[in-house]
Amino acid sequence: MEHSLYPVPPRFTVRRLVLMDLAAICTLYGACGRDAAWGTRETLAALFGEGEWWGGFLGGELVVCCACVPARSATPQAAALRGALAPARLPARFLLPPAATPEGRAFAGRFLSLLGERLWPPCASPEKRLAAAVPVKTGGLLLDGFFEAGFTLFLVRPLAALRPHYLLTPPGLRQPAPGTPNEDAVRRVHIPLADTLAVSRLLEQGFCGTALYEGADGQPALRLERPNPA
């Protein structure tokens, strides 16, 4: 019998979580520091009654997870997100800040893409509009996964304990006009990701964050885009 010289990589799967997964969820959030201080065992358990928990498993181990709740949910997390958005921009649901192991961060894009097939398909109707939140201080490694899955960054706002969060929307909900714009139709700006104030100001001016890349200094930089006036 012939054997491969290379180990088979562990399989990555996504499924809806149940209350029996609570201990693993708590472990992930417990390792996220102050940005996840809101994630007490009681709070995380309560979210099972308010919405849905989803997780990504690598070789059977939970490595990334997040909760999706209705925007009108009574949870403090949903209330904080509602307060950060104007009524006209309020979506139907919120994807609360995720938690992941170092291995799970590398699978964040795949996790969100698979999750999107279930929760925000490309032809999503208005009642399926969604906004996701990612903490600025510790979420940078996850942010790349959101961009990989097609999300767009549109705001930076203080949320839990006044800590700033990125707010993003998934693909299919902010579609550009048909056709490929020429270079003159879109203005592009590149800003160090660490310059949160500059990023926030550009987002307020109508720019959207679309990608992360490594800058000349080796630090993460954010690409922002805005259509030029016709």
Stretches with model-predicted labels:
Residues M1-L17, P121-A230:
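Terminal substrate-recognition subdomain of acyl/acetyltransferases
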Residues L44-A45, L112, L143, V199:
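Short amphipathic alpha-helical segments and helix-helix/interface helices
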Residues A45-V64, V69-T75, T210, D217-A221:
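A short helix-loop-beta-strand connector motif used in the catalytic cores of GNAT acetyltransferases and
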Residues G51, A88, S125-R129:
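A general structural motif
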Residues A100-W120:
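Conserved acetyl-CoA-binding loop-helix of GNAT-fold acetyltransferases
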